[in-house]
Amino acid sequence: MVSSTLLVMSISLFLGLSILLVVHGKDFNQDIDITWGDGRGNILNNGTLLNLGLDQSSGSGFQSKAEYLYGKVDMQIKLVPGNSAGTVTTFYLKSQGLTWDEIDFEFLGNVSGDPYIVHTNVYTQGKGDREQQFYLWFDPTAAFHNYSILWNPSHIVFYIDGKPIREFKNLEVLGVAYPKNQPMRMYGSLWNADDWATRGGLVKTNWSQGPFVASFMNYNSENACVWSIVNGTTTTSPCSPGDSTSSSSSSTSEWFSQRGMDSSSKKVLRWVQRKFMVYNYCKDKKRFSNGLPVECTAKNKNTKS
């Protein structure tokens, strides 16, 4: 009973503190290129706000000017309000080429009153199929919320308002590919995916509710390692703790050398997954009838991460 009480107190304290998280953002004009949408994406308010639009003709999207090899990136997002069924808003990291790496946040719209689903995935060398989905436990359309990706040599962690919701560990020792050699850009987009996004495609986009708008602010890449090209030559080594390619050596050391989550973070992770997870590829034996992926059966339990 005492241990249960302490667990509740610990989680409550962690959740309360995470609300105080402050993200210092950059100027979108300096850090972001709007890459598609024919004017449906706009940078406003002296570079502090970016809106993406979607109508029946097209969605819109952007990418970071810089590429990163490892980092912690944050974005505050306010999702499409009202009947957003069929729409997908994204925030993700992705490399180039046919054997790309990718770390995804995708927010699946729904009919008014139903909760949003956040869809996460990790691609390595062009292969994904590592989906985990969660209901959001708040209204993501009423205010901006902070979404973060931590990617270092040991693990990848997805955060919402400072709370870890998923961890993908480096299990190369077991033959599981891990993103480590390909620099990634940060991307965001708003697009129509009514063939699959809402109830497996059963609910279609109601275009009379459009145009749809998702808003982004406070992009923070201060703790990301910029992949640099000097005199036409690509720097092939990632930054390490204290490297000048990151703007803050002390904070770089903290996230770069992190080998796993501490006990309090693990408790919050378990709480989120127990309460809000709606799909986990590591539990889908029907889909993987010939055996679950290696990381799902590893002793260090990537199954719940």
Swiss-Prot record:
Q: Where is the GH16 domain?
A: 26-216
> Where is the site labelled Important for catalytic activity?
104
Q: Which GO terms describe its molecular function?
A: hydrolase activity, hydrolyzing O-glycosyl compounds; polysaccharide binding; xyloglucan:xyloglucosyl transferase activity
Which catalytic reaction applies to this protein? breaks a beta-(1->4) bond in the backbone of a xyloglucan and transfers the xyloglucanyl segment on to O-4 of the non-reducing terminal glucose residue of an acceptor, which can be a xyloglucan or an oligosaccharide of xyloglucan
Carries keyword Disulfide bond? yes
The protein's UniProt keywords, in alphabetical order, are: Apoplast, Cell wall, Cell wall biogenesis/degradation, Disulfide bond, Glycoprotein, Glycosidase, Hydrolase, Secreted, Signal, Transferase
Give residue spans, biased composition: Low complexity. 236-253
What residue range is the signal peptide? Answer: 1-25
Q: Name one GO cellular component term.
A: apoplast
Q: List the disulfide bonds.
A: 225-239, 282-296
Q: In which tissues is it expressed?
A: Predominantly expressed in green siliques.
Record EC number = 2.4.1.207
Q: PTM comment for this protein?
A: Contains at least one intrachain disulfide bond essential for its enzymatic activity.
Q: Any idea which positions bind xyloglucan?
A: 106, 119-121, 129-131, 195-196, 200, 287
Q: Which PANTHER family does the annotation name?
A: XYLOGLUCAN ENDOTRANSGLUCOSYLASE/HYDROLASE PROTEIN 8-RELATED
Recorded protein name is Probable xyloglucan endotransglucosylase/hydrolase protein 21
Species of the source: Arabidopsis thaliana (Mouse-ear cress)
